Amino acid sequence: MGCIKVDPPYWWTGMRDSTLQLMVSARNIGYAEFSVNYPGVRIDRQFRLDSPNYRFIYLTILPDAKPGVLRLNYVLGGRKSAIRFSLHERDTCRRGAAGFDAGDVLYLLMPDRFARGVPADKRVRNKGVASLTHPTTDDRENPDARHGGNIAGIREHLDYLDSLGVTAIWVGPVLENDMPGGSYHGYATTDYYRVDPRLGTNDEWREMVEVAHRRGLKVVMDMIFNHTGSEHRWLKDSPSADWYNHPAGDKMTNYRLTTLHDPYVSQYDLDRTVNGWFVPSMPDLNQRNPEVMRYLTQNSIWWIEQSGIDGIRMDTYPYADMQAMSKWCADVLREYPDLNIVGECWYVNEAGAAYWQRSNRLNTRETNLPTVMDFWPMANARRAFGEPTECMGGLNEIYDHLAQDFLFPDPQRILTFLDNHDTDRFLCEAPETEADLGPWKQAMTWLLTTRGIPQIYYGTELLMSGTKVWTDGDVRRDMPGGFPEDETDCFDPAGRTPLQREAWDFLSGLLHFRRGELNDVIAQGSLKHFMPEDGVYVYERRLGDRSVTVLMNGNDEPRKIDTSRISEILPPGSVRTDIISGEPVRVEPEMSFGPRQILILV
């Protein structure tokens, strides 16, 4: 019969949901009959679907069940045997599942490209890699190959992230991607219960999260439920004929997410969007199959309980079945009410993104999704902060974008970002002079002081640049100094260029200000802004009698403004402190601004 695999590999007592699905896989195990004799645990039902190589067992774990090892006894072909299955005690004292919100700043990193550390046990690592069908080798000269970063490298640089000033880490996918090519990005899962051994082990992941928590850093885990990798065992031997959509791989998605809210959509177009494969190496899971969705839901809960992650970023969210994902959100949040989930809803228009946020009256169906990603700045901020603020251009675009927030049920629960691993970097080309940093500084200032949950992409603090013109790998370059053979170490201030030091210090200063005593003003405060006039954009965040006021000149030339129009937030003669310079600023009837100058007044 060969090796028997049980998913999940273990579980816990005391969970809110007492039902547990076990997927047992082995040759002809579908014909086995299972029984259990363990206090507080019973088998409610068991069955196989189309494949003889899977058996689904539904257990009820009663509140009085104790931690221990139970025996799943079974009879197959007249022979008796048993599988040992552990029930663990929940660690109710451990930090984790705390969620993330507008008081946080997420730092997105790709494990393969951030840093290579020393694995906890090289023998375990080597054995794990040897078990892969496509182990691959590191090739740092190839932008689309593995470069060798790992979980140990993240753990070894948590102090760097803390010193930078971020409060949460969004870690790109870490689960097994046993694929013949392109596996470094992690978005083609081949085992939902195993960290890719090239990145580390399940224990190393849990320990990294624990160390991050001790440093006051939250961890957000990237998950992918729309599709698997084409090398997943399910595609070769599906538990049921409808486990995947179009299992022959003859239909790709049309990527037209507008079909999901188009009142005139054809069924053909809608089906193509949701049921087509994302790419030929990423077959589309059928979330309408209840066994698929139960498996995926339990997998989420298992990783939260196993490692104590604080949030989930769900990839390609709208491409999965809306009703099934709505139930997934509800089920996960019922078990972990403080957790936050952000869905990748790739719309560059505000209405499309808002449609997916929970409690949206524009959507006749409830999504239960707390947080959505705001792709508009990714598509438009480079232009808005780079061109002159004249007529309707420049910072007027930022003003107009925020004016669309009426579409969102909760604008503070929008993940706002300028770039990520799937997009051109905000800096397509590296700046050469300090003057070139003007638009970048203004974009960072806005990102960290506007409404919502800001996310920055690794290397932003070092002015990393790149575009997707030739390859995705150009926007996923290695972090300088993350690998022992690197000649330049930008984790060390001494390894940074003068321009990088200027950028790092500026961004770090903003981040530390944001997580300081006025954090709640930015996280919870109201937002009031004024249309740019004479090229200067002004907005205020206020909570009670405390405020943060931002003024920025969106032009490359000096400008003056009449302050009477903003007197409702900056009374004439009042004195504030600019947190960038540390100098007092008196509100005069007329104020002058240098090219691209920023004031952050408290």
Where are these regions (language model features)?
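Substrate-binding/active-site clefts of carbohydrate-active enzymes
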Residues: 114-301, 306, 325-336, 340, ...
